[in-house]
């Protein structure tokens, strides 16, 4: 049976950005809007390993987790009809970054450090990198270090003070513009 082809601006979209910017929630809705599958990289790793991300960090360390991320990206970059939501640090790996930038549009989601902290604190204990005395300062430091890498994305969208639907609408609009600019 032939696959029904519907017009869409891309068949593989990556969402990147710092933790707490809304990649997972927005990714699910974006996938629905584009009629694509959705994979959250952290959940994918948890399913494959049978271990939660906080437990991977706690028992195996960040380095082991980053290797798992890299391997998962290598595997998923070959898929089609997919919105892939990365973990906050995944795009920092040069090999993963190159593969994803070459595969399809990469969308960087942004939010202020205060918004990120407020969102992250909704699920205390789920953000291993924020288990420090001053999480807001940690967010600012990490965000400052990662921002130049996130800026390599094709598309940039702020999620501060916005509904998921608004953000998805802006992403779809920018994906179409990106596709048109590339002659797709």
UniProtKB/Swiss-Prot annotation:
Q: Which UniProt keywords apply?
A: Amino-acid biosynthesis, Aromatic amino acid biosynthesis, ATP-binding, Cytoplasm, Kinase, Magnesium, Metal-binding, Nucleotide-binding, Transferase
Short name of one Pfam family: SKI
Q: What is its EC number?
A: 2.7.1.71
Q: Where does Mg(2+) bind?
A: 24
Write down the required cofactor(s). Answer: Mg(2+)
UniProt-listed InterPro entries: P-loop_NTPase, Shikimate/glucono_kinase, Shikimate_kinase/TSH1, Shikimate_kinase_CS
Name of the top EC class for this enzyme = transferase
| Catalysed conversion reaction | shikimate + ATP = 3-phosphoshikimate + ADP + H(+)
Binding-site list for ATP = 20-25, 127, 162
Report residues binding substrate.
42, 66, 88, 146
SUPFAM superfamilies documented for this protein: P-loop containing nucleoside triphosphate hydrolases
Tell me which PROSITE patterns the record gives: SHIKIMATE_KINASE (PS01128)
Q: Name one GO biological process term.
A: aromatic amino acid family biosynthetic process
Q: Under which pathway is this protein filed?
A: Metabolic intermediate biosynthesis; chorismate biosynthesis; chorismate from D-erythrose 4-phosphate and phosphoenolpyruvate: step 5/7
The entry's cellular-component GO terms read: cytosol
**Free-text remark on how the cofactor is bound:** Binds 1 Mg(2+) ion per subunit.
State one molecular function term (GO). Answer: shikimate kinase activity
* Subcellular location, record wording: Cytoplasm
On whether Transmembrane is a keyword of this UniProt record, the answer is: no
Top-level taxon in the UniProt lineage? Bacteria
For this chain, the family text in UniProt reads:
Belongs to the shikimate kinase family.
**PANTHER family, alphabetized:** SHIKIMATE KINASE, SHIKIMATE KINASE 1, CHLOROPLASTIC
Provide the assembly information: Monomer.
The UniProt function text for this chain reads: Catalyzes the specific phosphorylation of the 3-hydroxyl group of shikimic acid using ATP as a cosubstrate.
Official protein name in the record:
Shikimate kinase
Query: Which organism does this record belong to?
Result: Thermus thermophilus (strain ATCC BAA-163 / DSM 7039 / HB27)
